[in-house]
Each structure stands twice: as C-alpha cells, then as structure tokens.
C-alpha cells in the first residue's frame, strides 16, 4: 500500500512539473477545407480547399472559389493575416465580373491544426448577401516539414 501511494505521489509530482500542452505554431503551409453556407445563386453549401502559409507571424492564403457544382472559378480568393500566439486572423477578397466578396476568418491553433470560422460578404448586381463559413487547416508532422538551410 505504501508503494502504491509513493508511486502515485511521484506521478503527480512529474505531471505538475511538466510543461503545459500548447499548440506549436510553426512556419509552414497548412492545408484544409472550408464549408460555406448556400448563397441565393448557388444550389448547395460549398466545401472547398484552403491553403495558409505562415512565416514569422504573418499569414497569406488562397481559397478555391466554386459557384457551380462542376467548375472552379479561374481566380481564387486571396488574402493575408496575422498569427498572435495561438490565434490566427485572415482577411481576403475575391472578384470575377460583377460578383465579388470580402472574407474574414479567425480561429485558434490546437496542436498542429486550427479551426477557422468567419463570413463572406458578397456583392452581386447591387445586392448584398453574407454567408457563414467554417473549416480547419492542418500542417504536416514536424519531420515532414522542409529543413532550414544552414
């Protein structure tokens, strides 16, 4: 019984001395998908790829735009953002013909991924519509990241 008590005390001490688990936001390319609500001129919700590159606290991203079930738009949504600790903020735009939108997404990193939420505010022929988007991005495991050149 004394042995069990000592073992539990030792385990508790080791756990208390360990570092807290926090996300390690590394300079890397994070890939994932965003699901956005239906627009008045689309038939369904849209699930599209997003790629976010983080370098020294700055972010830039590309997000695929699809207005129909088959064709991807020639121009992708593009934007920039910031990483502050475990938080990420992204802002971008897209335009094609008379349609355009402004996007804002934000989220938090947990381990090697981040969950994103935000909105796209569309303008089409003088009408405005806002839709919600949510998704996630994830970086490769650390051993698979490009190595720094020395």
Region annotations inferred by a language model:
Residues 9-17:
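Hydrophobic helical h-region of N-terminal Sec-dependent signal peptides
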Residues 19-23:
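Sec/Tat signal peptide C-region and signal peptidase I cleavage site
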Residues 24-111, 117-150:
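Central antiparallel beta-sheet cores of small beta-barrel/beta-sandwich binding domains
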Residues 1-9:
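Bacterial N-terminal signal peptides that target proteins for export
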């Amino acid at each position: 019984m004394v042995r069990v008590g000592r073992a539990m005390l030792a385990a508790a001490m080791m756990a208390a001395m360990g570092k807290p688990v926090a996300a390690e936001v590394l300079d890397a390319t994070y890939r994932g998908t965003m699901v956005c609500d239906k627009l008045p001129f689309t038939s369904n919700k849209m699930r599209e790829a997003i790629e976010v590159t983080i370098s020294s606290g700055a972010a830039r991203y590309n997000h695929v735009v699809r207005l129909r079930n088959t064709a991807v738009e020639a121009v992708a949504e593009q934007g920039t953002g910031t990483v502050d600790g475990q938080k990420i903020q992204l802002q971008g735009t897209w335009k094609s013909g008379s349609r355009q939108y402004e996007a804002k997404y934000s989220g938090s990193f947990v381990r090697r991924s981040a969950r994103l939420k935000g909105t796209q505010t569309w303008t089409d022929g003088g009408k405005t519509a806002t839709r919600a988007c949510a998704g996630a991005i994830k970086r490769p495991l650390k051993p698979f990241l490009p190595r720094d050149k020395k």
